[in-house]
Amino acid sequence: MKTTLILSMLAGMISQSCIVSQDAIVPSENYLTQQVNVEAFDGIKTSTAIDVVYTQADRTAVEIYAPDNLMEYVKVESRDGLLNVYFESDETGKSLNIRGNHKTQVRVSAPAVHTLQASSAGDIVLANGLKTDGCVRIESSSSGDIEGADISCEELKIQASSAGDIELERVECSSLHAEASSSGDVSVSGVARSAKFEASSAGDIDADELKAEEVIAKASSAGDVSCHAVASLEASTSSAGNVRYKGNPKDIRIHSKGVQKID
C-alpha cells in the first residue's frame, strides 16, 4: 500500500515537472530584427529583463532584436509620453517563463529624452550620451541598471533604490540631485554648479569625481556618500551613515560625526 502511494506521488511530481518544463520557453539561437512604429515619446521605461540601447538622433527609429521565439512577446509602446518596453504575459496571463540566457534588445534612436527608468533587471545604455537644455530624470530600481557618459543638461535628478545601479560619466549640469536607498548605487563624475546627495538604508553614492561648487551631503542608516566640494559643503550623518569629501571648500558646515576628508 505504501509502495503504491509513493509511486503515485512520484508520478504526480514527474507530471507536474513536465508541465512546468512545457510552460517554459527556451530562447532560440536564431535572432531576428523587427522595426516598430511608435507614437511620440519623451522618456523610456524598461520593466523586465530587456536591455534598451538609446542613441540621441534627429529622427525616431525603434527596432527589436530578439530570439525568434521571443519576438512576439516583446512589447514596445508609447503611453503617457513614455516608451514602455516589456515582455507580455503568456496565453494564460502568467508572467513569461523564460528558461535560459538570451540577449533581447530594444534599440531606440530619438531626439533628446528627459526620463529614463529601469526596473526588474532591465538595463538602459546611453550609446552616445544625452544633451538637452531641460531637466533629466534617471531612475533605477529592483536590479535595473542605467549607464552612460557625456550627459549635458540644466538639471539632473538621479534616484537608485532596491539594488538598482546608475553609472554616469562626464556629466555637465547646473543642478544635480542624487538619491540612493535600499542598496541602490549611484556613481557619477563630471562638473556641476550645485549638488545634493542623499544616501540611506545602505545606499551608496560615489561622486568624488564630480566637482561641484556647492554641495549638500546627507547619509543615514548605513548609507555612504563620497563627494567633491569646491566652494562650500554642508554635511550631516545619522545611524551609521558616512560622508567623505574631496576638495578644499572655504565654507564648511558639518552637523554630525561620520564626516571625513579624503586625501
Model-based region annotation:
Residues 8, 18-120, 124-140, 150-160, ...:
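Acidic (Asp/Glu) and glycine-rich low-complexity loops/linkers
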Residues 1, 141-143:
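A generic hydrophobic-segment detector
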Residues 1-16:
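Sec-dependent bacterial lipoprotein signal peptides
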Residues 119-127, 146-148, 166-168, 186, ...:
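Beta-strand-rich extracellular passenger or scaffold domains
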Residues 42, 58-60, 82, 122, ...:
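Structural signal for glycine-centered tight turns and loop->strand junctions in beta-sheet-rich domains
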Residues 48, 76, 116, 142, ...:
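A residue-level signal for conserved active-site and pocket-lining positions in enzyme catalytic cores
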Residues 166-263:
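Short, surface-exposed interaction patches in beta-rich subdomains
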